[in-house]
Swiss-Prot record:
The keyword Chaperone is annotated on this UniProt entry: no
Similarity field: Belongs to the transferase hexapeptide repeat family.
UniProt keyword Isomerase, yes or no: no
Provenance organism: Shigella dysenteriae serotype 1 (strain Sd197)
Function text: Overproduction of CaiE stimulates the activity of CaiB and CaiD.
Example GO biological process: carnitine metabolic process
Superkingdom of source: Bacteria
Keywords on record: Repeat, Transferase
Molecular-function GO term, any one: transferase activity
Protein name as catalogued: Carnitine operon protein CaiE
Residue span of region Disordered: 173-196
Bias kind Polar residues: ranges: 187-196
């Protein structure tokens, strides 16, 4: 793991969290219990404070940053998809930010909301609970359905379970020269399938 102190501030990571060795945490970063931080994520607390609350996940290649005197917060059980950028914003409890989305300064994503992949949420946007947001700029198109929220929660549970799986078995290795016979497929811990 790459942890860096900045002007005397050292990242704080709960012992039950998993931070991938290629992720970078700088300065005023607080990572809560059971959090998953994926490969190549950058959490740069060299201006504002970054808080990732319990059970949330920050996936591969995500960036968190913010201005001085601001907090960038991912609420409890928040789900931040691959390549998303969060800058000086607040992601509500149990909300999902889709892959490669950008959430700008002062924006607030409501609890149990879903931001569709590749959306751009403008600075100062204030969402309500359980909105489906999409587009560039993003706008609320309807409420999140019970089925969609269930699907989101199954995906988040997969990442919460992945924390323990990574602690138990992830380690650096050398590649095999050829695939062994009868190689098993990896299995998830829920019955979640891709949304179509």
């Amino acid at each position: 793991m790459s942890y860096y102190a900045f002007e005397g501030l050292i990242p704080v990571v709960h012992p039950t969290a998993f931070v991938h060795p290629s992720a970078v945490l700088i300065g005023y970063v607080i990572v809560g219990a059971g959090v998953y931080i994926g490969p190549l994520a950058s959490l740069r607390g060299d201006y504002g404070r970054l808080i990732v609350q319990a059970g949330a996940n920050i996936q591969d290649g995500c960036i968190m940053h913010g201005y001085c005197d601001t907090d960038t917060i991912v609420g409890e059980n928040g789900h931040i998809g691959h390549g998303a950028i969060l800058h000086g914003c607040v992601i509500g409890r149990d909300a999902l930010v889709g892959m490669n989305s950008v959430i700008m300064d002062g924006a607030v994503i409501g609890e149990e909301s879903i931001v569709a992949a590749m959306s751009f949420v403008k600075a100062g946007f204030h969402g309500e609970k359980r909105q489906l947001l999409m587009g560039t700029p993003a706008r609320a198109v309807r409420s999140v359905s019970d089925d969609e929220l269930h699907w989101k929660r199954l995906n988040t549970k997969e990442y919460q379970d992945l924390v323990g799986r990574c602690h138990a078995s992830l380690h650096e290795t050398q590649p095999l020269r050829q695939m062994e016979e009868n190689r098993p497929r990896l299995q998830g811990t829920t019955d979640v399938t891709p949304k179509r």
